């Protein structure tokens, strides 16, 4: 029975999950909910189902896999990672995965706070000023390894790819000083399942954020 992934019809917090499902050749329904336009941003399409799905903490994204009903994007990825043994194999690798999962979420939220701010035009230069230091930390953490936990891909690589790619869209030159991060992105996009997905009609790279964001390339 196929899994069901529910989320808005945007990239957002579901991108890494969709990439992981495609990479692992998982059968799933990508259930997308639409949001209305300004000024109301009507969410009735989701709200009409929100409390009828049996979710403990009803929210988007959600994943339903048989009797397992999961919310919180990182919990979903971790669940999928365990199913496919892509969570790190040694304690050192698992520590790296745990640290990076949270670091990537911090970076994602920092960018989102800027992009959703009514004061976007003032906050953008401030954010860009601190961006090289953020990217430097990711570059140093990756080092010469092909993947962030080591020699084998883990679910956290899907998260970090998403975060790096969002920043590459936000500031196209942000990875230029970090060849290993550029190589990582190219390596990830070169994976056959990922490459095939990105060329398919199912692939959704934009919009990144919901309609109320002040920066949201279409």
UniProtKB/Swiss-Prot annotation:
It is an enzyme of class 2 (transferase). Keywords: Cytoplasm, Lipid metabolism, Olfaction, Phosphoprotein, Sensory transduction, Transferase. Belongs to the GST superfamily. Mu family. Homodimer or heterodimer. Yb subclass selectively binds steroid hormones. Conjugation of reduced glutathione to a wide number of exogenous and endogenous hydrophobic electrophiles. Participates in the formation of novel hepoxilin regioisomers. This is Glutathione S-transferase Mu 2. The gene is Gstm2.
């Amino acid at each position: 029975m196929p899994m069901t992934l529910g989320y808005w019809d945007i990239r957002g917090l579901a991108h890494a999950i969709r990439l992981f499902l495609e990479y692992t050749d998982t059968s799933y329904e990508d259930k997308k909910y639409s949001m209305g336009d300004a000024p109301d941003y009507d969410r009735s399409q989701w709200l009409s189902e929100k409390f009828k799905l049996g979710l403990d903490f009803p929210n988007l994204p959600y994943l339903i896999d048989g009797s397992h009903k999961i919310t919180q994007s990182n919990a979903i990825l971790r669940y999928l990672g365990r199913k496919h043994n892509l969570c790190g194999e040694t304690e050192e690798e698992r520590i790296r995965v745990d640290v990076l999962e949270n670091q990537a979420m911090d970076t994602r939220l920092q960018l989102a706070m800027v992009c959703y701010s009514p004061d976007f035009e003032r906050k953008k230069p401030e954010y860009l000023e601190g961006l090289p230091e953020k990217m430097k930390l990711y570059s140093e953490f990756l080092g010469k390894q092909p993947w962030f936990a080591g020699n084998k891909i883990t679910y956290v690589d899907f998260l970090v790819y998403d975060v790096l790619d969002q920043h590459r869209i936000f500031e196209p030159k942000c990875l230029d000083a970090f060849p290993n991060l550029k190589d990582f992105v190219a390596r990830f996009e070169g994976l056959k399942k990922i490459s095939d997905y990105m060329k398919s009609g199912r692939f959704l790279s934009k919009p990144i954020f919901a309609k109320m964001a002040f920066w949201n390339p279409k």
